């Protein structure tokens, strides 16, 4: 069996778009027709891989195959052998499952070592840029990512609905990239200039440096920054990102002012001693929400870096004294692990070896509850300051394994 590769093969094309063009280049009427032929060929060459081959285009990507992803990887590798091209492999186009999570425990996918929050992957509506479709008839992977709402090449808004039938656009259903299911030619649509905030976010996600957002070389970090902002400040789909630019233009001072307000409110409304008050009562999920974006160390996580800097300053401004202050707030084990840029297992080791003292008394043979305030903020900060975070690691190890 032999397959002719489509023309204009580029690295930024989505897997599904490439499969549609592969169908056309080889004379198949639909993806399902081609999928059945490929599955029959795989059955003769590797029956395990054949069983994992997707028959529906919308389920073709590897991240959809939770239990058979290994076999599907093998299937795509075999498919590469049928193509007469030196273009990027099928696996390079795939979105892969990954064990890396974004806080607070949000799933992610990976492509070419870039970690993307799963919630950013569009499934129902996949917008298009008519000008791009006029220049090249394929769908870039960027159009599948939800914060990308403006074409960074043409500075126009992406089109989400067909102007003829008003139905949402999704080329995975129609298996046509330049036309809607109703037959309307999407290349004829007049585009609208994108608002500044949409243009800036789209350029940022596309890898361009923009002055008003943090300059981070790692694309995974950029996705983490956008995700953190949306989860913290945008509480419904009707909210927009208009304040994002002004927020990060004054980073980290804008964030510090917010934390200062929380500190002041806690002091004004204090009901019990701070050494009996949980950190989350004063600052909410400020630590838990930035634990992994997707990295744990401040060098690769600007939000955690800002939080750590603020808390160090807070402890310095509130030295230990007879009356408990904000430096004596109680952290739970998850917050402590976040502040120390390490794992929960390492925190337990630090307790066992006496580096961390519990602020509470545990019953014999009992285990700490994840949400139970058990460590003083001051002590965790001092322990962190006593260690140097290695720049090559995504996780600090305070003690070697047993």
Language model regions located:
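Basic, alpha-helical nucleic-acid-binding regions used in initiation and control of genome expression
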Residues: 1-402
């Amino acid at each position: 069996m032999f397959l002719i590769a489509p023309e204009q093969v580029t690295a930024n094309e989505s897997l599904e778009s490439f499969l549609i063009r592969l169908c056309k280049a080889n004379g198949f009427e639909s993806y399902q027709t081609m999928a059945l032929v490929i599955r029959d060929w795989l059955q003769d060459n590797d029956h395990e891989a054949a069983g994992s081959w997707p028959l529906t285009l919308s389920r073709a990507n590897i991240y959809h195959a939770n239990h058979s992803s290994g076999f599907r990887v093998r299937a795509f590798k075999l498919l590469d052998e049928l193509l007469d091209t030196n273009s990027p492999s099928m696996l390079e186009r795939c979105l892969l499952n990954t064990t890396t999570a974004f806080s607070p425990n949000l799933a992610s996918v990976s492509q070419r070592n870039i970690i993307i929050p799963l919630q950013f992957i569009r499934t129902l509506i996949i917008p298009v840029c008519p000008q791009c479709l006029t220049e090249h008839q394929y769908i870039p992977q960027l159009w599948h990512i939800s914060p990308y709402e403006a074409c960074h090449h043409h500075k126009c808004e992406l089109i989400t609905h067909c102007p003829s039938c008003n139905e949402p656009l999704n080329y995975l259903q129609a298996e046509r990239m330049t036309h809607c299911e109703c037959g309307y030619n999407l290349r004829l649509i007049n585009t609208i200039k994108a608002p500044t905030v949409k243009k800036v976010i789209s350029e940022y996600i596309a890898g361009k440096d923009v002055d008003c957002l943090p300059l981070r070389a790692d694309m995974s970090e950029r996705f983490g920054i956008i995700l953190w902002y949306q989860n913290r400040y945008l509480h419904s789909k009707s909210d927009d990102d208009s304040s994002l630019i002004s927020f990060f233009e004054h980073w980290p001072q804008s964030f510090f002012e917010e934390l200062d307000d929380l500190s002041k409110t806690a002091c004004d409304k204090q009901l019990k001693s701070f050494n009996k008050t949980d950190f989350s009562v004063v600052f909410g999920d400020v630590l838990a929400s930035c634990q992994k974006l997707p990295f744990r160390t401040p060098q690769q996580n600007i939000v955690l870096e800002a939080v750590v800097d603020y808390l160090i300053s807070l402890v310095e401004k509130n030295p230990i004294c007879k009356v408990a202050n904000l430096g004596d707030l109680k952290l739970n084990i998850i917050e402590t692990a976040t502040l120390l840029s390490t794992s929960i297992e390492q925190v337990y080791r630090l307790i066992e070896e006496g580096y961390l003292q519990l602020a509470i008394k545990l019953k014999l043979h009992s285990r700490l509850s994840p949400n139970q305030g058990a460590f003083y903020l001051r002590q965790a900060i001092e322990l962190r300051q006593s260690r140097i975070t290695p720049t090559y690691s995504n996780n600090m190890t305070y003690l070697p394994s047993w």
